[in-house]
Amino acid sequence: MSRYRGPRLRIIRRLGELPGFTSKTTTRTSSPGQHGGSNFAKSSAYGIRLQEKQKLRFNYGITERQLLSYVKKAKRMKGSTGEVLLQLLEMRLDNVVFRLGMAPTVVAARQLISHGHIVVNDQKVTIPSYACQVKDVISVRAKNNSRKMVTEANSTATANVPSHLSWNKESLVGVVNKVIDRKDVGLQLNELLVVEYYSR
């Protein structure tokens, strides 16, 4: 399944606030569609699990295949599968760039990385799914256009940098200090329902 490229407000009306997906908000409380969406998806156990799974997909900008791969990897690792899954997604380079305020959304962060504007430990990295590690240093290439794009994005960033990261606004350098705590994940969802969805 490919990444979503349709209207973003339609998605957040259905799933709620998704900071990595869009900074836009909506005042409409009904689900999209002529009759406000189907009640089946809201009330059935399957529908609720599907909705939580979709929150992860859209917020982190990943495909169904990628999410399934992360779930399988989380199951092989120590700890709560749901919490480990969130940690794996949060440590993706595109998400770290977004959480540092270097880009307004995960999609924008992915473009920065793909176009060669981001450096990790003094090496240019162009793979958005690159798994960041503790003590990784994320910075901007020493090119005027690269620094300008990040500076502009950072000046309009509204979210605070989470405690597992640190950010120097003057030098445009960020550091991964530790693995993220569950309370710092900027998304309202029940990750256990996502694990249950893939355990069917």
Curated annotation (Swiss-Prot):
MF (Gene Ontology): rRNA binding; structural constituent of ribosome
The protein's name: Small ribosomal subunit protein uS4c
Organism: Oltmannsiellopsis viridis
One Pfam family it belongs to: Ribosomal_S4
Quaternary context: Part of the 30S ribosomal subunit. Contacts protein S5. The interaction surface between S4 and S5 is involved in control of translational fidelity.
InterPro entries per record: Ribosomal_uS4, Ribosomal_uS4_bac-type, Ribosomal_uS4_CS, Ribosomal_uS4_N, S4_RNA-bd, S4_RNA-bd_sf
Broad class of where this protein is predominantly found: plastid
Family per similarity comment: Belongs to the universal ribosomal protein uS4 family.
Claim: DNA-binding is one of the keywords in the record: no
CC terms in the record's Gene Ontology section: chloroplast; small ribosomal subunit
